[in-house]
Amino acid sequence: MTSKFRRAGSAVAIVAALGLALSACGGSGSGSDGEGGGDTSSITFIPKNLGNPYFDASDAGGKKAADEIGTTWKQVGPTESTPDSQVSFINTATQQRAGALVVSANDPKAIGDALDEARNAGTKVVTMDSDTEPQFRDVFVSQADAAGIAKSQVDLIAEQIGDKGEIAILSAAANATNQNEWIKLMEEELAANHPDIKLVDTVYGNDDDQTSFDKTAGLLQSHPNLKGIISPTTVGIAAAARYLSDSEYKGKVALTGLGTPNQMREYIKDGTVKSFALWDPEQLGYLAAYAADALASGDIEGKEGDTFKAGDLGEYTVGADGVIVLGEPTVFEESNIDDFDF
């Protein structure tokens, strides 16, 4: 089977990719033209929740881009990824006349009114990683093609369990736009191309380490014939790996998903996990900052075909529905995981 995720090949290719890694979604609605304007020297980043290593990496990328641009970047946000937990932070940024917001949405609709108010006040809105409904933002910076992510997750688990048996999904929040899209596409991919793999359960750890750990235990207790788990969330896959590594299921139940090399290195090396994947979240924040600045500066409007330069990442083009795609993720395994540090 083939995977849309790229596996690192030559040492030269790895070094080149690492260089980028260490350097670091439509169109505008009627609210975008509100009078009053914002401060184009300010970008406010609102992740799903604070204390999440994935978003810490995105924050670092955004700060790096802001330094290169000569603008300011700050991160604020909730401690829990509930549907409306970001609203107060959006409202505060609007009152402070931020030039742009970069938001990873916990819910596609719950923050819509707050984002409308921000855009009416002249603030540009970039969603990143997890989108809102398109009418609430100017552009969405997507980590990768959703269908490709879903297919690759299924391919990875199928490879590890011999393309047959029971699997489950450990997701983040039940309302997370990106997670739900991936899960829907994974279900379609399984039905179309993997008739001997049965998805028996989908559970939600809410991007909380302990909850995800407990949900992993619950899956294994509820489904004694489980052969594998897909966790398309960095918090979830790390918590599941921690549980498996000290349990009787180590080496018997496969685990894959989306994780960072630094979180997952020990579990690759001790044999708990064979392979997993991710794009570089630092690059994602880096690209989102450049997109936000291009909008706030008037260089782009968020229309299909608009182009802008994103520092070391090069030129990007806005696609249909205002989507900007970072690129294809990498598969991490024992042979290459030490070549990455994020």
What are these regions (language model features)?
Residues M1-S23:
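Sec-dependent bacterial lipoprotein signal peptides
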Residues L22-G38:
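Bacterial lipoprotein signal-peptidase II cleavage site
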Residues D33, I111-G148, E159, E166, ...:
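Flexible loop/hinge segments that line or gate small-molecule binding clefts
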